[in-house]
């Protein structure tokens, strides 16, 4: 998998699942174009994140990142278009989710985190191959979606449509 570098003085190595730089402690995440992991600075006044190379653009952590720490996606707030009255702020990858596990069961969260990591890697690879990536909201007939559900008999793993 491709690695990335922080823009801090140490040019710290960043990995695909990195959520902070171990050298400078800045928040890092997958950018909104879904092609690189890079650092973000937080602006207390606006309550938003920004990139040093693009300071005018405002970013926010994906809700699944901010609330459950299951992804490291960042969302460009200037490009955000609410879908069907849904006020969730979701990154590129999380917009492909149709079903997530029952999050009232705390044991599901680390399992969902593993599934999300695998999904992001798969989407990243498909994008790198220049394959079309459209979710069900964008293309109801042919769009790609992910349903992460629990197995009815065993509570220690998830089942996706790909398992069938």
Labelled PLM ranges:
Residues 141-144, 149-164:
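Hydrophobic helix-coil surface modules that form long, contiguous segments used
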């Amino acid at each position: 998998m491709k690695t990335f570098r922080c823009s801090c003085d140490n040019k710290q190595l960043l990995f695909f699942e990195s959520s902070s730089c171990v050298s400078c402690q800045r928040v890092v995440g997958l950018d909104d174009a879904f092609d690189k992991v890079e650092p973000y600075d937080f602006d207390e006044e606006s309550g938003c994140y920004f990139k040093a190379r693009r300071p005018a653009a405002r970013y926010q952590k994906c809700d699944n990142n901010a609330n459950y720490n299951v992804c490291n996606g960042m969302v460009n707030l200037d490009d955000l278009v609410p879908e069907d009255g849904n006020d969730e702020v979701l990154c590129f990858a999380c917009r492909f989710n149709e079903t997530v596990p029952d999050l009232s069961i705390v044991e599901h969260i680390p399992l969902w985190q593993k599934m999300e990591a695998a999904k992001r890697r798969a989407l990243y690879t498909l994008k790198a191959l220049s394959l079309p990536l459209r979710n069900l909201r964008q293309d109801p007939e042919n769009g790609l979606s992910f349903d992460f559900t629990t197995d009815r008999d065993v509570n220690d793993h998830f089942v996706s449509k790909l398992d069938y």
